[in-house]
């Protein structure tokens, strides 16, 4: 599996069409031509699968919850537990998240029906792009983007 733009090893998948990409720059190029209906069979299969419902467990350790979340994703889409902790420790990210507009965007994205459509729209907003770039900079510190 390779990035659809630069053919490097991918680290992410497009939320709309699930094609692999490796960086913010490649995602931006891809989203210009993204076709969310490119994989309708996969969407039908996923929607036909029963969703796993888990009973909330009281006093469950945060690390265990994060580990369970990580285990639910595809291998190449995973973010390491350490990188998730680094996101939580980032002063820059915390500062961005103090912005009420960004917080509302995040709530809308979390609660939205068509997350891919919302993601495409939000990636046009400079504040959201700054947030995404900040997250990627923490998760991929070796990647230096010209943005």
Swiss-Prot record:
Entry binding sites for Zn(2+) 1: 3, 6, 22, 26
Subcellular localization(s) per the UniProt record: Cytoplasm; Nucleus
Binding locations of Zn(2+) 2: 14, 17, 30, 34
Zinc finger (HIT-type): 3-34
Molecular-function GO terms, alphabetical: zinc ion binding
Keywords: Cytoplasm, Metal-binding, Nucleus, Phosphoprotein, Zinc, Zinc-finger
InterPro entries given in the database record: BCD1, Znf_HIT, ZNHIT3_C
Keyword Glycoprotein: no
GO biological process: box C/D snoRNP assembly; maturation of LSU-rRNA from tricistronic rRNA transcript (SSU-rRNA, 5.8S rRNA, LSU-rRNA); snoRNA localization
Keyword Chloroplast part of the UniProt annotation: no
Residues with PTM Phosphoserine: 72
Region of interest (Disordered), ranges: 45-67
GO cellular component: cytoplasm; nucleus; pre-snoRNP complex
PANTHER family: BOX C_D SNORNA PROTEIN 1-RELATED, ZINC FINGER HIT DOMAIN-CONTAINING PROTEIN 3
Oligomeric form and interacting partners: Thyroid receptor interacting proteins (TRIPs) specifically interact with the ligand binding domain of the thyroid receptor (TR). Requires the presence of thyroid hormone for its interaction. Interacts with NUFIP1. Interacts (via HIT-type zinc finger) with the RUVBL1/RUVBL2 complex in the presence of ADP.
Protein name listed in UniProt: Zinc finger HIT domain-containing protein 3
Species, as recorded: Macaca mulatta
